[in-house]
Amino acid sequence: MFKKIKRNLKILLLLTYNSLKITSQSRQGMIFFTLGKILRFLLLFGIIFLVFSKTKIIAGWSLKQVIILYLTFNFIDTFSQVLYREVYRFRPLVVSGNLDLILVKPYHPFLRLLLGGVDLFDLLLLLPYLFLLLLFIFQENVSFFSFLLYLVLVVNGLIIATAFHIGVLGFGLLTTEIDNVIMIYRDLLNLGRFPIEIYQQVISLIFTFIIPIGVMITFPVKALFGFLSFKNIVFSFFISFFLLWLSVKLWQIGLKRYQSAGG
Amino acid sequence: MIVVKNLIKIYKIYQKTGRLITDIFFRKYEEVLALDKVSFEIGKNELVAFIGPNGAGKTTTLKILSGILFPTAGYVSVLGFFPFEKKEAFLKQISFIMGQRNQLIPDLTAMDTFLLNKEIYEIDDYQFKKNLQKLTAIFSAEKIIHQPVKMLSLGERMKMEFIAALLHQPRIVFLDEPTIGLDIFSQEAIREFIKDYQKEFKATIILTSHYLEDVKRLAKRLIIINKGKILYDGSLTAILQRFSQIKYVSLILEKKVKQEALFKIGKPIVYQLPKVIFQVEKKELPRIVAYINNKIPYLDLVIEDEKIEEVIKSLFKNQR
């Protein structure tokens, strides 16, 4: 078991190193990509301050709470993008048929298809988010238990993000039109930048129970401030593991039905 | 080593009608029978060639044997494994090379892919160095392994694909159109490489190719497949004995011979005196040779088999 983990880590490191070598070949692209992300982050930060200059509370959330939520969103979103960048390159692999040569390799294909393109430059962006997030959290009066629960629920949010990405891979085997699926995921996730309470009740329920963006982002922050009920904590874990199970099933069904290009 | 019994594969192909609503909500699928109760066995250190026209089922067979595709029905066992389960112990013993697909990372050097495969297949440093040296030497490719793959020619890239796929010394190698698109020199290099590799590593090799030259030069056993059915499974020489009904009799005449005497043999397909060539029925050959010996003065007599390409072509024609 330990040997297997060690081997997988070695492969992952090599894949990451190769990905870094490829990214660093286009330096200008890398700089503009990073600048664009920083600009987007600052603009949204500005909008939050602008809204709160007109009002003190939004849907029961104070300025600092909304900032923590926004930074939590950025952390989960960026972290899942850092890890799962390769999912965005899945369609060309299926269409070209090069996926076949990955499926005959003696390792779990997720190692390559899910984690095979870890973007270290996005990882660098994660550090200021993390710094700001911790800075704002420690300015608030939160208990150690609430903070611990917050961390656990953030990890739970990452499990949901993982399930979404595996689901996209599964869809990619059944239909090559996955670029739309991943864009829908990105658009929906973007709605999680703000507390789900700002949306109408029906939409808010959808974001909790059907497309659990609220569970991914709003729930950890609610737990941090002691707003989250025990029932919802249990539900969070249930939904993440259910989605993970469902996405792996979808992948397995996809593999069985996979027809391979030119087959 | 490889056992296949009554293998069936059905593809579901989406049929576009061109009507938007129907295409979105009432999709129609056509079922295409790609393999129809295919059975065969392949032993250790065999080099078997699968040939057939496009869509015959060659690549589908290879993809099922390597675990890429799930069979619709039938029994498949490769090295004692059901390939689709993709057990690590199984995948470590096989390799798949496709002429039109790449495992090499285009932006990096071939060596980067080799090093990645070293970890994936858990090849130790000594073995890796030894195998790499041996494989690059066969191809005389010591220098190009350090060049970015995207800068290599198709022939060079294919050589690198071979090295990447064989570094772990697989026991079974699947080759799908390995020489497609290559110039004659690269084709020759690849053929020599396959031969040398099989000899050196005692591997079982299953090859598909549209080039009969590949088959003639490499395989002793031939499996001819068309429309998902096996038409022939046997040696290259036996195919002529079994399916060829024709022989070519070529004569160089010693002196002028009356046309009527010659035409008693049959209508010649080449009549450029002193050279005359006849296409005759195999069963008629003893009678014709006796007649020539008695009645026709000649300097040279050559009897040739029908070309293997012609035999295979007529086999496919008869199946249509």
Residue locations for each model-derived region?
Chain B
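Conserved ABC ATPase signature
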Residues: D107, P148-G155
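Conserved ABC ATPase "signature" region
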Residues: L20-D23, L115, E119, Y126-I144
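Catalytic Walker B motif of ABC-type/P-loop ATPase nucleotide-binding domains
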Residues: V173-E177
